[in-house]
Amino acid sequence: MMLPTIVEWSEPDQKILLEPYTYLGINTDKELPAMVTRAFNHWYQVPQPALDIILKIVGPIHVASLLIDDIQDDSDLRKGKPVAHTVYGVAQTINTATYVFFDAYRNISKLTPFLKSPEITDLGSIIDDEIMALHRGQGKDLYWRDSLICPTEEEYLRMIHNKTGAMFRLPIKLLQALSPVESLPDCFPLVNIIGILAQIQNDLLSLSREFTEDKGFCEDFSEGKFSFPIIHAIKADSSNSLLMDILRSRPKDEATKRKALRYMNDQTKSLDHAFKVIRKLEKIAKEEIEKLGGNPELSSIFELIHFSSTPEIDDQ
């Protein structure tokens, strides 16, 4: 028997392997983590070549995590089209997501020439720490969902500090390690606020009419997910089991989901509550930006994602 000779991994092979990833068609440069990273470089002044490498690490990891999220949430849509695992299968999608994680990780060695901080010699540990945080947060989220345990708002905020915050802290920690600026500002209170703000905004949007085209109608109910406004509604009246019963049944029909949405909007005012928390977080974030000396690009991002009012819902 003739053993195969060792050959280089070819471009056609790579293209096939990455199909579930490229299928999503996500422009990572326009995703919020990348936008925030570029804006924070106003303070860190990392050279453009190093910034580009950081974005090549963070962008793919972000998209790979979405591939896994869609499987774990049993989602139907992502960006308005069928999720990758319904097209390519669960096994291939998991394999692709894992491959993308490791492929992105390999870029970390390209940052070594730009290292400025003598205290940091292992950039890989930055990625390790935040990927661990992401999985810890996701683990809590899945545990609550599958055990039908409603967390408190405080517990939920701690969870998203890990799960969502990781994708914002990771690139900022890399910027910090590579920054030539001698007296660096402490940007991490602001980074953490942005992570929490982004998740609560997403939670509120997922119940809105605007989100239906991208992810389907009120998919958090179908996924049995304890989002920020859903948690508020459950805790607002623990004697009413409506939402817990609906989350347990994971409904697909719009009538049941509209019933839950009307209850949250009219009875517990949970959408208004989430909106007020968002406004409060926006105010705190803007104050932090001013403390750090201002940042026009970051301020522009806040204007872009700002909610002027509670998003319109479709509860009729």
Swiss-Prot record:
Amino-acid positions noted as binding Mg(2+) 1 in the UniProt annotation, renumbered to this chain: 69, 73
Entry's Gene Ontology molecular function annotations: lyase activity; metal ion binding; prenyltransferase activity
Cofactor: Mg(2+)
Co-factor: note: Binds 2 Mg(2+) ions per subunit.
Gene3D superfamilies: Farnesyl Diphosphate Synthase (1.10.600.10)
InterPro entries registered for this protein in UniProt: Isoprenoid_synthase_dom_sf (IPR008949), Polyprenyl_synt (IPR000092)
Keyword tags: Lyase, Magnesium, Metal-binding
GO biological process: isoprenoid biosynthetic process
Record-listed E.C. numbers: 4.2.3.-
Protein name: IDS-like terpene synthase 2
Record organism: Melampsora larici-populina (strain 98AG31 / pathotype 3-4-7)
Gene that encodes it: ILTPS2
